[in-house]
Amino acid sequence: MMNFRQRMGWIGVGLYLLASAAAFYYVFEINETYNKLALEHIQQHPQEPQEGTTWTHSLKVRLLSLPFWLWTIIFLIPYLQMFLFLYSCTRADPKTVGYCIIPICLAVICNRHQTFVKASNQISRLQLIDT
């Protein structure tokens, strides 16, 4: 039997995937516009910076020149982290919620490593008594 947290987790996962599908449709629908802007940016001849250019225009030009794989990584990591967090809310054990988020996962791994080192140091301090 699922509890309330698990039900809300599955509803969250469903809504998140639905919103993702809508966002992907929107992105690929405007992909043609992005390609046109990128081609215009490439076809322009290098010019001296004009005095009237604003910082927003120069920022837009620099961001458009970033490669596609970098944009993918920038958006994919937070997307997957949010999805994995929502998915972890569907687990039966409430103690495992959030373990798949990278900072929490690293903290748990480091804590386990420190605990293992402490335990092995305590074992090595024990002396065997030979009878």
From Swiss-Prot:
A cellular-component GO term for this protein: Golgi apparatus
Transmembrane regions listed in the UniProt entry: 8-28, 66-86
Membrane topology category: Multi-pass membrane protein
Any GO BP: lysosome organization
Keyword ATP-binding: no
Pfam family, one: TMEM251
Assigned keywords, A-Z: Golgi apparatus, Membrane, Transmembrane, Transmembrane helix
InterPro entries xrefs: LYSET
Subcellular location: Golgi apparatus membrane
Function: Required for mannose-6-phosphate-dependent trafficking of lysosomal enzymes. LYSET bridges GlcNAc-1-phosphate transferase (GNPTAB), to the membrane-bound transcription factor site-1 protease (MBTPS1), thus allowing proteolytic activation of the GNPTAB. GNPTAB is involved in the regulation of M6P-dependent Golgi-to-lysosome trafficking of lysosomal enzymes. LYSET is thus an essential factor for maturation and delivery of lysosomal hydrolases.
Protein name: Lysosomal enzyme trafficking factor
Lineage, uppermost ranks: Eukaryota, Metazoa, Chordata, Craniata, Vertebrata
GN (gene name): LYSET
